[in-house]
A protein has these predicted regions:
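Phosphate-binding loop that captures ATP/GTP phosphates
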Residues: 90-148, 212
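Hydrophobic micro-sites
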Residues: 4-33, 217-257
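Extended, non-globular alpha-helical segments
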Residues: 33-61, 131-133, 148
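Inter-motif core of Ras-like GTPase G domains
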Residues: 191-209
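Conserved nucleotide-binding/hydrolysis micro-motifs of P-loop NTPases
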Residues: 104-106, 130, 151-154, 186-187, ...
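Phosphate-binding/switch loop-helix module in NTP-utilizing enzymes
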Residues: 131, 149-189
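Walker A/P-loop phosphate-binding motif and the immediately C-terminal alpha-helix
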Residues: 44-113
Length: 257
């Protein structure tokens, strides 16, 4: 069907007959880069993150999904907040979880968790003497490990596409049960495409009233061009008064698409 160049207002348009999972998050999630799943674990929004976790786990039935890229079509769509909270709820299950801030252009994980960014992914890739154990930080009061971006480099795409990155990812796969890579938007730079081709699955974050339909479709095409395994879509920024369900999710399986 023809897609108009308008902002996303509801889930019905989602990719015509090619829609996959849609997981709704209400508008509380954009009240700053806060770790809502820890600050308010009994809130509706925290439960929504647990719902997303459950849906990802269902996708693991037929194949192992250990490494996940989180991305979006553009900025301000909530991918970094979603990444942090999703990593947090996975760690609540006793799993060994690592959040990697692989947005080497506008990193946020160090701000979200209030930790140092003097060293991180970029220094781990560029300094042979630096080790994973020296660089990863465990968040106080949780079982969650975070690998911040490190200093912003002049060559993000080259670092992510390097042999050293491939070797690092293999090491992390051996150390952790779940690894979430927070990436830049798909349509702005090639970083997300590079990483999407390396991981087990991709979660795409779409923001109600912000994301442009044509941009989302273009981003989906770019991911499919590198044979990315798109696990599903998170639709966030839903207001109570918009007429949508305040919590919950919609689901369309691959077989129904």
């Amino acid at each position: 069907p023809e897609i108009e160049k308008t902002r996303i207002g509801d889930e019905k348009y989602m990719f015509g007959s090619n829609k996959k999972k849609i997981m709704k998050l209400d508008n509380q999630q954009r009240k700053g880069l806060s770790l809502i799943s820890k600050m308010k674990p009994k809130s509706v929004i925290a439960e929504q993150y647990r719902t997303i976790r459950t849906n990802i786990q269902f996708s693991m039935v037929d194949r192992e999904v250990k490494s996940i890229v989180m991305t979006s079509s553009g900025p301000w769509e909530g991918k970094s907040t979603t990444s942090a909270n999703l990593a947090s709820v996975f760690s609540d299950q006793g799993k060994k979880v690592l959040l990697v801030d692989a947005d080497l252009r506008k990193p946020t994980a160090h701000k979200t968790f209030g930790i140092s960014n003097l060293k991180g992914l970029t220094t781990l890739l560029s300094l042979p003497e630096q080790t994973i154990l020296d660089t990863v930080q465990t968040i106080t009061g949780t079982d969650l490990d975070v690998l911040t971006s490190g200093p912003v480099p002049p060559n993000p795409s080259e670092l992510l596409n390097s042999n050293r990155m491939n070797a690092l990812m293999k090491q992390l796969d051996a150390m952790y049960d779940v690894i979430i890579y927070d990436m830049p938007p798909v349509t702005s730079v090639t970083d997300a495409q590079i990483m999407a081709a390396k991981v087990d699955g991709v979660i795409f974050v779409v923001r109600h009233g912000v994301s442009q339909k044509d941009a989302v479709l273009n981003a989906k095409d770019l991911l499919e061009n590198v044979n990315a395994n798109i696990l599903g879509f998170v639709l966030n920024g839903i207001e109570k008064k918009s007429g949508h369900a305040y919590y919950g999710y919609g689901y369309t399986s691959e077989g129904d698409a």
